[in-house]
Amino acid sequence: MEIDKRLIVLLKRSADEIKKTVIGKDDIIIKILMTACAGGHILLEDIPGVGKTTMAVAFSKALSLKYNRMQFTSDVMPADVTGFYMPNRATGEFDFKPGAVFCNLFLADEINRTSSKTQSALLEAMEGEIGRAHV
């Protein structure tokens, strides 16, 4: 019961901190916090210029999360999202270079503008298939 009360206090403080930056979106803030607690993914669809990126940055700051943003375009490759192995000449081995999804909060902007292979790589990462072998 004590943990539940502490979680509620923490979520309220986080919501209050986010509301200092994001005005008039109280219901969305609560829904995003609930989804984050459940370990889910969030899809924000809206017209340009209404503060989706600002909201993501506010969340990352309020919750002390590592934040990455990627603008998806036709030239973004799957490895940009998920990472890749690069040869290390000094050791003769391959070093993993993590992609943009290796963070706590990842904002994928304009997903529809990229190739289907890159979209598939993003969906695999969202399903948790990417990263298990790398961490």
Language-model features: where?
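Pre-Walker A (pre-P-loop) alpha-helix and adjacent loop at the N terminus of AAA/AAA+ ATPase modules
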Residues: D4-V50
